[in-house]
Amino acid sequence: RAWINENLMATLTHISQESYTSGSWDHQPDTLGDLKTSRIKDEFTDDEWDQTSLTLEGNIGESSFTYAGTFFDRDVRYLWDYNDYVEYYSLDAVGVNGFGYASYYTCDYYSYYYYGTYDCNNPTMWADYSLSMERDTHELRFSGGVEGDKVQWLIGVFYDKLENPYQYTYKWPGLQDEWSNGSFGGTGIAGREGIWWDADNLRKDETKAVYGEAIISLNENTDLTVGLRAFDSKLTFDAKDGYFGGYGIDYYGHEANRTEKDSGISPKLAISRTLENDALLYFNFSQGYRPAGTNRTNKNSDSAPLYYDSDELNNYEVGYKYSNSDGTQRFNIAGYMMDWKDMQTAVYDRDLATIQFNTNIGDARITGVELDWTIITDNGFFIVLGASLIDPKLEEDFVLNGVVQATSGTQLANVAKQKASIAINKEFSFAGRNAYWDLNLSRTGKRESSITNPVNQPAYTLGSFSSTLEGENWDGTLYIDNISDERAVIWEYQGFRPETKFTNRPREIGIRLKYKL
């Protein structure tokens, strides 16, 4: 950070990170046992990214300005085992008995049919995914006025450009040559041997926006905020994907080019009033949208749509904020309603497609109440209580390909209707040194895994405890994460592997030491 002159300051930041993980967060407790899962191919994720940011802050007369630019690059590769797919279509699928669909492509069918022998290749399959993302954002805003002025204002421009080439390759080295290269009755593609499915896609997003906001003091206790954001976005998809083994040309998938443009004006409105006890009563309205996208589908077999459209959100919130004069109590409560127009969501239903896909499920509404209460007691306890009640549901039937998949009133996926938490902190002295302990408990209510054919995901409670001793230039912490060793069902996979559940970390007890140089 440096002062260029008395009116202009520059801040340059660079962050570089690389992480590598192996294994998976899912397990099969009912069939294999607690924290156990079955894999043939080792799984890993390799994630590397760099971000450079430049911020310029300065003054021009009575107004101030800020420029913020960010340049982001990310390369990711991960590999995951896909043998549950092979097993399902070899042995477990309805109508498959013994010599299954998947075996048909890895075994010599004629040896089995005429001689009763199994001349089979290794059926192991895995998915290899990679992306190389580049994103640049630029924002310039000017503001004027300070708290207490009749009018405070803000205007700005924004630009966002994203380029994201990504590739999914489902590798099946044991695929019989006649199916993968088309040499013997098959319909594969020469040079694509050993590949079951390949998706080579490029997505480009470009967004331009101008915005303005004014805070108008109606009187000494009431402020009115009005704002507008005009945006123009352009999304370009270049999608090439499809089966390369064992199917006709009609099933090779898509070479789809699509350009979608969106533009509009999103309003913002807020009014707040300070009450006699210095509490704040407020109302907010805001509007936003999410851009469209594309799915991985083949031309004929999947019910999943090739494209899904943008959606729009109108958010209404009314709330109350209170803090007493000595800061020992703070209380916030808010009620909100989120109206979604043609809501986007992810659907995983094997009756509709063999992979998860995104689609527009129609209008939806989420209403809720949330509160938090902070208390500092006379004997030094710092306590934070939080809770929320949510009603997330469809406002109309979800219809896909002329068939009702979920009726109006269905609970939205992966949204808990109840949540609660408590955090307690206490400072104390030990051996003449400052110390403190923290206790955190949270409760998450039950959820549904999908909008169609949902699996009930039970409620769970997580807790953690830590105690820290502070030295002059060091800290030592004893901690216990997941005190009760809870196995939360974060999400239950409805795929080919039975009852696969993604869970949290098991109980961990440890010591952390920090030394300040």
Task: Please state what every model-predicted region is.
Residues 339, 382, 442-450, 469-517:
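C-terminal beta-signal and adjacent terminal beta-strands/loops
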Residues 1-21, 47-54, 133-134, 142-148, ...:
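Transmembrane beta-barrel wall of Gram-negative outer-membrane proteins
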Residues 6-10, 62-65, 150-151, 221-224, ...:
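Repeated loop/turn-to-beta-strand initiation elements of outer-membrane beta-barrel proteins
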